[in-house]
Amino acid sequence: GFYKSFPGYLVSLTGSDKNQENITLHVGSPGIRGEYYIWEKNDGGARYLFSQQEKIDSLNLNSYQAINYTASDGVKMQGWLLMPRSGNPKALVNYIHGGPHGPYVGFWFDWRMQAMAEMGYAVFAPNFRGSGGYGNNFERAGYTKWGTRMLDDMREGAEFVMENFDVGERVYTLGGSYGGYSSAQNVIRHN
């Protein structure tokens, strides 16, 4: 029940007492630095503890939009879109996470995405197959597909965004670690 209360977010167990009757949970996404909740067995529910982002909220930064799309082979995908405040993006940045077997939806506040949006770019962060946080089958679907199907998922996500949002006519791709590798491979595979 608690996990279903936060669709599109990564909910993680962060601690428990030694009897595992009281646990703390973290809820995060690229736009939410982190909220903590405690679930107490005796109460049968969770209650809010605190947020890591009160100071960040005061900056009035751009908000993320969850994007759901279907890959050409029918697999459901999810990603995050961040639009610039100007409302007229110069181009779309397809921002690829590292790993690759780690979700883009994580505990951290992604200052890079906010910086790119402040510079006038629309930023899309796809959770392509192989990303963690969407179940074992979804993560395993990316095994041995680093330079093929996973790259197609990234491109198809960017194409979906371009078809459905005013993000300009150019697409740039970048990332670190596997994100950097896949950015280079995308140029080769998709010209």
What is each PLM-predicted segment?
Residues 2:
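Conserved phosphoryl-transfer catalytic core
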Residues 10-191:
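Serine-hydrolase catalytic core recognition
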